[in-house]
Amino acid sequence: MKNEPPKVIIAMKPSLLVLIDGMPQMGDVPGTKLRSVINSRSIILYDNEKELYYLRVQDWWLQAKVIEGPWEYAKKLSDAMKKAEEIVASQNDGQNPEGGQTTQQPSLKGSKKKVEFAETPAVYVAFEPTEMIETKGEPTYSQIQGTNLKYVVNTTGNIFRRADGEYYMLLSGRWFKGGTLDGPWTFVAATDMPTDFAKIPKDNPKAVVLASVPGTPEAKEALIANSIPQTATITRSEAKLTVQYDGEPSFVPIQGTSMSYAKNTSAAVIKAFDDYYCVEAGVWFKAASPEGPWVVADTVPAQTYNIPPSSPLHNVTYVKGYNSTLDVVHVGYTSGYYGTVVSASTNTVVFGTGWYYPP
């Protein structure tokens, strides 16, 4: 697994983090002349005529001249934007930018035609792996009894400060340390973890981090839970799979193996020799063609389980078939299939391989 620190933003007022997988890739919005950013989970539109970007925040829109901001509330929408709003509302009802906190919404005062807007939240647009931790104002600290640690009280994140002034932060199960809250941050290996963290009392609000402290009973329990497979019995005749490609199936090599995977589909399709394999909902399927027809697989090539963490298909290595009959196949997967894996550096459960998979 990889343990490089992401970019970290400490936000001390209501803020939104908008993640884009690399530089913006644009697509057409059906029925309009607008464009949309297709490589982001956030709803971002671009109006060519007005030369403005629009970002949807709950039921409202922010606008900016450049995608990095600054952003402000859009007080008047064009007819094209109103039409686009209907489209995206039906397709993405309730969707928010990932990592974003719920911020104060515009309020109606006096006449129904007059809208008074709340303060615009700070919007951070990131094109690389980024984490944001929001505090309610300047950080305030509380001492953890029996340790030399203090933790930040006014945040939902996990930030600690030692007596020597060094900061520790838990992100996706990994520990990072820095001399200030502005960083730079470095990964903390198990051998460098201060012993004070294992002494956090179980009744302390921050006892939840004990599952990520190497060697603690909580960390050992998490390892056991992570290794227990979720099993199912799949009836062959009932299991169906259809794979959609963006154009003709296109395959790229999987490093460290003789296999390749389809890069133009959201499905995990692997080519091994003259056969094709695909994992869907924790079940292996097999076909003689990338378009199918697909049937439940009894076995998969051994090298499938050598797919490295650097590959976007590493998660399929946690899916297995145990045994089968003419009618059913017994399958199972451990938590790594959904991204909860074990870090060899700390022997603790972490979230994600730490690798960035470009779109």
Language-model region placement:
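N-terminal low-complexity segments enriched in Gly/Pro/Tyr/Ser
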Residues: 1-359
